[in-house]
Amino acid sequence: MRILNFGSLNVDYVYSVEYFVRAGETLKVNSREVLPGGKGLNQSVALARAGADVCHAGCIGADGAFLRDLLNENGVDTAYLRTIDGMQGHTIIQVDRKGENCILLYGGSNRRISKAQIDETLAHFGPGDWLVLQNEVNNLPLIVDLASARGMRIVLNPSPYDDGLKAVDFGKLSWLLVNEVEACQCSGSDEPERAWDVLHARYPGLSVLITLGSAGSIAYSVTAEGLDTVRQQAFQADAVDTTAAGDTFTGFFIGGLAEGRPLDECMRRASMASAISVTRMGAAVSIPKREEVEARLAEI
């Protein structure tokens, strides 16, 4: 069993500010960093640091070679990562004094994934393997359809949400991982926890995890025995940068599922990993290793 992440890789330009810039305003920044990022890259790093056997597929520009190096350094298999002509995907991130972030995303190389690359990559995977997806790459509906035909277990984190996701067949997914806003967007509901009822009625075989910020998270897992519902509290942390919180949670959660861990244990480990990540600046660089997560949990 392997995990394939067909995901984005970005260069993150991170600006520390007192508050988010307003329309028509020019704002001085306190500092600037250039860091590796992208939801796909972050989740692959989180999966690897959680102890998973993960492969990353996608595209990088000529200026993105250091992103491949970072994945390799973290034990991620990059055999399915392609270098293309053109600009690397990147983000412009404002981080305010409360640790909250505001992000502009330029797709670049992440929007250059071809059907030929998809076919070639998926040919190496099959039943029992996991596929992790986010909404920062092109051809997402095609990837889902082809992976489903190969019997893969598909996890989608539909972020950032846009209308293109309406072309994705959610009935072919094993898990949908969303925050409060995305839960409402995917279901059309006004309340995050009501979203489960709507999604379950449409896609009876779909399991859903909803992260609820400071209120923790809740998972609805559809199994052969019925429905398993688990709620997990959020661990307290002195946040300085929340950029990688969701991606860290996703990586540790999926890594736990792939290992066959109980659902409540997967959520507990993911919640602690996420709490640790927000105490550090940056995205991929803030993600803890499983040994640190387990040590912190043992202290509780």
Where are these regions (language model features)?
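Positively charged, low-complexity intrinsically disordered leader regions
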Residues: 1-23
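Ribokinase/PfkB-type carbohydrate-kinase core domain
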Residues: 1-9, 69-83, 93-231, 292
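Substrate-binding N-lobe of the ribokinase-like
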Residues: 2-3, 23-90, 291, 295-300
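Conserved phosphate-binding/catalytic region of the ribokinase-like
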Residues: 3, 163, 192-300
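Active-site metal-binding loops of divalent metal-dependent hydrolases
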Residues: 9, 39, 248
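Nucleotide phosphate-binding site architecture
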Residues: 12, 184, 284
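Short glycine/proline- and charge-enriched loop/turn segments
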Residues: 20-29, 177-179, 230-233
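Gly/Ala-rich phosphate-binding loop of Rossmann-like dinucleotide-binding domains
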Residues: 48, 148, 258
